[in-house]
């Protein structure tokens, strides 16, 4: 066999191998995502993404309580809250939290009445990516049909 013929032969075998691998990969059944394993007793999360979103919310809520004890009022933004408790400056830099987007709203109605709301909105709402809502009372509400609000059921 000539050298040119050998190169064509191996190129043909390689092409068939690549095509075969491509076809078998395309026909392979999709692997179901592993079932969520609770991180602690009574974990209300339904997925790893929810666990991360709820963890972020708990950190913000604890930091707000600490901030209020130190300054006699709540932080007016996530940037102002940064460095309080375990809420880091890096956590305050972006509202993109993986599969979720965080939103923070502060409102002062009078010198002795202030409110804040924290929401975690999933990029794709479904039963394992619920939306979450919390206010200054610290209760976290969840909904898998629409954006969570004060009227949504509380998570455990």
Predicted regions and their residues:
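Bacterial N-terminal signal peptides
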Residues: 11-21
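Bacterial N-terminal signal peptides that target proteins for export
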Residues: 2-12
């Amino acid at each position: 066999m000539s050298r040119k013929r050998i190169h064509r032969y191996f190129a043909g075998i390689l092409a068939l191998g690549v095509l075969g691998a491509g076809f078998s990969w395309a026909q392979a059944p999709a692997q179901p995502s592993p079932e969520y394993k609770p991180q602690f007793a009574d974990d209300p999360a339904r997925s790893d993404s929810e666990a991360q979103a709820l963890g972020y919310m708990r950190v913000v809520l604890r930091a707000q309580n600490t901030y209020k004890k130190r300054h006699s009022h709540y932080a007016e933004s996530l940037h102002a809250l940064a460095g309080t408790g375990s809420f880091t400056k890096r956590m305050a830099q972006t509202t993109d939290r993986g599969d979720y987007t965080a939103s923070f709203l502060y409102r002062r109605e009078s010198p002795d009445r202030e409110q804040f709301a924290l929401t975690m909105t999933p990029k794709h709402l479904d039963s394992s990516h619920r939306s979450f809502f919390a206010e200054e009372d610290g209760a976290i509400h969840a909904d898998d049909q629409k954006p969570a609000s004060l009227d949504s059921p509380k998570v455990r």
